[in-house]
Amino acid sequence: MLKPSRTHLTLRHEPHWIPAGLIHRLKSPRQLHDWLLDSSSLTAKIRIGCPEMDVRILSETYEKPLISEAHHLKIPLSQKTWIRCVFLMCNGQPIVYARTVIPYWKTGNPWYALKHLGNRPLGEVLFQLPNLKRTPFQITQTHAQNWPHLDLEDSKQIKTFARKSTFIQGKYPLLLTEAFIESSL
């Protein structure tokens, strides 16, 4: 069940990210491994089982990234970035929390056009782009309460299993984190 959102600028407990090859170290449900490791479009994969999947925007703003995001993107902690947090919903239930972080947010950045994305899933755009590069996944497990702009009832008890990778167009990165909500698995 959703609750009103609260704003976070930093996580209370930043997750510890590990390379996806170490997935056996996560205490994650076995059926989730394919989802965490699949490099194809998550949107397309979800739509196989949930054709009516939709997007609920939680936040879309210009703000400072999390410490781990700034380190991953090799940018100063004080640098503001474009951040979009959404739920991917199936039958009215949130199943994935997705967080997009784009540094160097200006008109010369090829990602700048995403400001008009609205309620469309990011995956519909990403996987249509030619010459797009993607870094290997990193994975983690953390409680739902630790993700910015994510509020669920009992979020202190709800675990998420997440993956992140960077998409690169030219010299411009886009960091995408996708957290699978345990209670919806």
Curated annotation (Swiss-Prot):
Residues where substrate binds: R84, L122, E178
Keywords linked to the UniProt accession: Cytoplasm, Lyase, Pyruvate, Ubiquinone biosynthesis
Cellular-component GO terms for this entry: cytosol
Example of a GO MF term: chorismate lyase activity
Enzyme Commission numbers on file: 4.1.3.40
Family the UniProt entry places it in: Belongs to the UbiC family.
HAMAP family referenced in this protein's UniProt entry, alphabetically: UbiC (MF_01632)
Free-text function comment from the UniProt entry: Removes the pyruvyl group from chorismate, with concomitant aromatization of the ring, to provide 4-hydroxybenzoate (4HB) for the ubiquinone pathway.
Protein name per UniProt: Probable chorismate pyruvate-lyase
Species per Swiss-Prot/TrEMBL record: Hydrogenovibrio crunogenus (strain DSM 25203 / XCL-2) (Thiomicrospira crunogena)
Gene name, Swiss-Prot/TrEMBL: ubiC
